[in-house]
Amino acid sequence: MMKRIFLFIVTNLAILLMLSITLRLLGVDRILDAEGSELNFNALLVFSAVLGFGGSLISLAMSKWSAKHMTGAMVIDVPSNSTEGWLVETVRRQAKAAGIGMPEVAIYDSPDINAFATGMNRNNALVAVSTGLLQKMNRDEAEAVLAHEVSHVANGDMVTLALIQGVVNTFVIFLSRIIGHIVDRAVFKSEEGHGPAYFVTSLIAQMVLGILATIIVMWFSRQREFRADAGSAQISGRNKMVAALRRLQQEYEPSHLPDKIAAFGISGQKSQIGRLFMSHPPLEERIQALQSA
């Protein structure tokens, strides 16, 4: 279930970059320059919030479309075999138990054991599983994974993530413009308006701060994984969820999911750049949390 967050974050950053460049070319950044010499901090904060939350909410609105196109997921409109029929009926039953609308159900081609859920709200979601999951997990284990994803939807994790990302975006944009202003004035000695140094420095600072701010989003993601595990235990049974996580420990293979959507999966393998950037807690910690609940 490691696809959701990287998809959201990368889409979000791409939208922010595109909007920043577009607004700069349109001259909107000029409202941040009061009397040609100093930043207008009130205007900057409003600008940052509009741009920051705008990028986040656009990413949320695009999440289902992006996930389908990036994984090649095929939505099951009419089940063509017993496996698809079981998959749709299991999600339908779990969605009813969780009190949410019936999500779209899809399958995407990948040898990994993986699944993800995304969408704008509890009644407009997508739950997708890999062919590898259907081949390598028994139905009890697969049922637990589906319940985990349904719990993400029921908990409103995508909306909460969008709000957190909006706050993070706001501060990233705000601070990057201040850094650009300082460099433009102190290093390049611009005395009136903002020169090219402000634009270039602001974009670089925005990208660097955006990467660092990812730590906050990843921490949030790890906490939500524990909650989704607990939700799965309530819907499908704790033993089934523990068995599913154990299966991942035994069968895990390097993910073939696009990196941009890796954070909405289930695997939770350790990140090469450290735990701060992990979207999922280690599997053993998740198992221990379930067993001690």
UniProtKB/Swiss-Prot annotation:
GO molecular function: any one? Answer: zinc ion binding
Question: Which cofactors are named for this entry?
Answer: Zn(2+)
- Membrane topology field: Multi-pass membrane protein
User: Which keywords belong to this entry?
Assistant: Cell inner membrane, Cell membrane, Hydrolase, Membrane, Metal-binding, Metalloprotease, Protease, Transmembrane, Transmembrane helix, Zinc
Look at the named UniProt entry and state the broad enzyme category this protein falls under.
Answer: hydrolase
Catalytic residues, chain numbering = E149
Subcellular location as annotated: Cell inner membrane
Q: Which residues cross the membrane?
A: 5-25, 43-63, 159-179, 199-219
Name this protein carries in UniProt: Protease HtpX homolog
